[in-house]
């Protein structure tokens, strides 16, 4: 079932694969594989790979990955290697830029051209960014995310970088009307689910210093106070905002922090190649009271022989994590 090739100028050479792991992380480019191949068996030698080679992985005849070998661990009879798709070049390279009156897609095309990264379809993002100044050396990936974040704040449209057949692309973030279903007793073999109030707040207090005065805004969860007692979250705000905006932020913080926090992770299941980070999946775990759609945050697919399993972590909302550009 595993088909693994090293692509040369004039031919594809098939590798003797023992196992392949394919993984990805939402908002953490790129996707990657770790593979173990047989290079020698008795007097018989087989094709191998070197750093910089392009490898292609297929499962049941469908291409799931194409990327560049970055690391190898040779052994007497086998070789383990890691390969990354084209988004690796956005992470590995840094630069400083000044963009004026450019759309995010135009910024991507400029960066790809400067760093000789081949491209496929790049969606027109519509919104013109008046100015984007990158004064310090910053990864190309973070520069692009800054442009995409500004675009989303102005248009509400969400875009995704991807790698396809060795080329960098940009598309509207997929939100399919039909999603895969994972269910205990059907295709889920294990999971970790926990609930906690360790990070819960029943009262929020924000403070801001200005002109030797302290401005304060607070919000409380009356139901939570009665049930869990006082669990106060405090924050000093440095942004230049007025009292109404300070109160609004306090209300937002309370909405984020009130109630019991639920965490669903390490979901182990029968492998489905299409279940990848950044895509929605419907999860049914009746014994935990879970029947809803989540977004895949991380995915790791394991292939060996004819067996395919996967482990995923999920999030409830497909929002940019704090700290992302």
Swiss-Prot record:
One protein family per Pfam: YQBQ
Disulfide bond annotation, renumbered to this chain: none
SUPFAM superfamilies found in the cross-reference section: Phage tail proteins
Domain of life: Bacteria
Family classification: To B.subtilis YqbQ.
Protein name according to UniProt: Phage-like element PBSX protein XkdQ
Species per Swiss-Prot/TrEMBL record: Bacillus subtilis (strain 168)
Gene symbol of the encoding locus: xkdQ
């Amino acid at each position: 079932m595993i088909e693994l090739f090293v692509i040369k100028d004039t031919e594809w050479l098939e590798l003797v694969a023992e196992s392949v792991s394919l993984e990805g992380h939402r908002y953490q480019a790129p996707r990657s594989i770790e593979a173990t191949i047989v290079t020698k068996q008795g007097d018989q030698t087989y094709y191998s790979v070197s750093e910089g080679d392009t490898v292609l992985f297929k499962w049941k005849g469908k291409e799931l990955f194409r990327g560049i070998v970055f690391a190898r661990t040779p052994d007497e009879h086998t070789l383990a290697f890691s390969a990354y798709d084209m988004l690796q070049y956005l992470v590995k390279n840094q630069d400083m830029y000044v963009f004026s009156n450019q759309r995010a897609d135009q910024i991507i095309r400029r960066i790809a051209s400067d760093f000789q990264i081949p491209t496929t379809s790049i969606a027109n993002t519509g919104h013109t960014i008046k100015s984007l100044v990158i004064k310090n050396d910053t990864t190309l990936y973070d520069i692009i995310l800054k442009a995409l974040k500004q675009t989303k704040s102005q248009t509400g449209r969400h875009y995704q970088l991807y790698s396809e057949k060795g080329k960098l692309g940009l598309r509207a973030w997929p939100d399919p009307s039909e999603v895969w279903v994972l269910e205990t007793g059907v295709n889920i073999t294990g999971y970790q689910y926990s609930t906690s109030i360790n990070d819960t707040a029943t009262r929020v207090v924000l403070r801001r210093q200005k002109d030797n005065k302290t401005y304060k805004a607070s919000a409380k969860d009356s139901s939570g106070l009665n049930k869990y007692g006082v669990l106060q979250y405090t924050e000093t705000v440095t942004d230049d905002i007025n009292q109404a905006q300070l109160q609004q932020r306090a209300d937002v913080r309370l909405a984020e922090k009130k109630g019991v926090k639920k965490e669903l992770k390490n979901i182990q299941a029968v492998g489905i190649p299409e279940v990848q980070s950044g895509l929605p999946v419907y999860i049914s775990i009746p014994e935990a009271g879970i029947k809803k759609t989540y977004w895949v945050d991380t995915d790791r697919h394991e292939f060996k022989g004819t067996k395919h399993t996967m482990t995923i972590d999920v999030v409830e909302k497909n929002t940019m994590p704090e700290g992302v550009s």
